[in-house]
Amino acid sequence: MAKRDYYEVLGVDKNASENDIKKAYRKAAMKYHPDKFANATDAEKKDAEEKFKEINEAYQVLSDNEKKQQYDQFGHAAFEQGGAGFGGGFNAGGFDFGDIFGDNIFGGGGGFGGFEGFSGFGGSSRRSYVEPGNDLRYNLEITLEEAAKGVEKTIKYKRTGKCEHCHGTGAEDDKMKTCPTCNGQGTIKTQQRTILGVMQSQSVCPDCHGTGKVPEKKCKHCRGTGTAKETVEKKINVPAGIDDGQKLKYAGLGEASQSGGPNGDLYIVIRIKPHDIFIRQGDNLYCEVPISYSTAVLGGEVEVPTLNGKKTVKVPEGTESGKLLKVSGEGIKSLKGYGKGDIIVKFTIETPKKLTDKQKELLQKFEESLNDKNYEQKTSFMKRLKKIFKDIID
C-alpha cells in the first residue's frame, strides 16, 4: 500500500510554518492517542495505531529541516533503505514527544513516555527501555585545499564515557538489585484527569533509567552513575570533495548510556576556512583575475590560479570587463566519486593610474584615431538615447 503524502497526513500545505506543523501534529496525535481507544474494538485499536504511527512518522520528517528538505526533493524515496535520507525508514526510538505536548499533557513527565515502538495498544508489560547515550557534535575547520583533496585529521574531544571501575554498572563489585521504585519493570505509570478523560502514561524510571536494576552499593568513583569524564583522541578521514556544513558520522563515539545501552554517535561538522582567492559554489570555484587594458584590447595570455598551481589561459581580443572564462576540470572533485568541477575566471580590466604627460598624450592621440565602429556598445546606446529624446520632442 502506497504511503500517504506527509503534508496530507498532518493536514498542512508545503508552505506551513514550523509552528503550524507542530499544532497540526498535536491535534492529530491527540485524536488517535492509544489511551483514547482503551475500550475500543481490536479493529478500531489497530486502525488507530496505524494512523498514530503515520502521524508521528510524518511529524518526525516535517519537523526536521534537513529531513523536510530531503522529503520535498525526493519524496518517500529519500527514507527508503539505501535512499538519500536516514536510511532505515521511520523509527520512533528517541523521538521526544515531550517537546510537542509538554511534560504533563498526557500525564507524568515524559509526554507519551513508554509508548515505545508504538506497541502501546497491547502486548507485554515488560519492555526494554534501554536508551543510547547522547550524540556529540564537533566542528572541524579545514582549508579549501584540504576539502578538495581530502585529508586526515586527528581530533581530541571530551565526553562522558563508562566508568572503568564499575564497567558502567554504577555498582561497587558489579552487584545489582531490583529497582524498588519500579519493581524491576523499568517504567513507572501515572494517571491524570484531563479534558479528554483519564489519561495514563508510562515513563522511564528515573532511578534505574529503564533497566529495572539499581546498584546494591554505589560505585565510589562515579557515585552510581556508571559514567566518567574522559578525553578521546580520534583520527578523522575527511573525503575529497566535502563541502562546508556537511557532516561525518562516527557511530558509537558519542557519550555513554546510563542505562546500559549503546554509546551515542559523534557528528563531525566540516567548516571550510574562507579562501584568499576562490569562492566555492558546489564543485565549481570562482575567482577574479585583473588584466591590463592593452591585454583586453589586443588579447594575450595570462596566468590564472588553480588549487594545483598556475595555469596559462588565452584572453580573447576585445575582452570586456566581467567576461567569464571556464577552466575545465580544475575545480573540486565530486564527493560522489566521479568528475571534477571547473574554475570560472572573471576578467576585470584594470584602468591604468598615475600616467605621465607623455602617456596621456599618446592615449589621447589613440582615442582620436578611433571611430564609432570601434565602440559598438557606445554607438548603439547613443542611437537609442537619440530616439528617446526625439520621441519626447515629437
Curated annotation (Swiss-Prot):
Any GO molecular function: heat shock protein binding
Matches recorded under InterPro entries: DnaJ, DnaJ_C, DnaJ_domain, DnaJ_domain_CS, HSP40/DnaJ_pept-bd, HSP_DnaJ_Cys-rich_dom, HSP_DnaJ_Cys-rich_dom_sf, J_dom_sf
Primary localization class, coarse: cytoplasm
Zinc finger (CR-type): 150-231
UniProt KW keywords: Chaperone, Cytoplasm, DNA replication, Metal-binding, Repeat, Stress response, Zinc, Zinc-finger
SMART domains: DnaJ
Location within or outside the cell: Cytoplasm
Disulfide bonds: none
Functional note: Participates actively in the response to hyperosmotic and heat shock by preventing the aggregation of stress-denatured proteins and by disaggregating proteins, also in an autonomous, DnaK-independent fashion. Unfolded proteins bind initially to DnaJ; upon interaction with the DnaJ-bound protein, DnaK hydrolyzes its bound ATP, resulting in the formation of a stable complex. GrpE releases ADP from DnaK; ATP binding to DnaK triggers the release of the substrate protein, thus completing the reaction cycle.
Entry remark concerning the domains of this protein: The J domain is necessary and sufficient to stimulate DnaK ATPase activity. Zinc center 1 plays an important role in the autonomous, DnaK-independent chaperone activity of DnaJ. Zinc center 2 is essential for interaction with DnaK and for DnaJ activity.
Subunit structure: Homodimer.
Protein name: Chaperone protein DnaJ
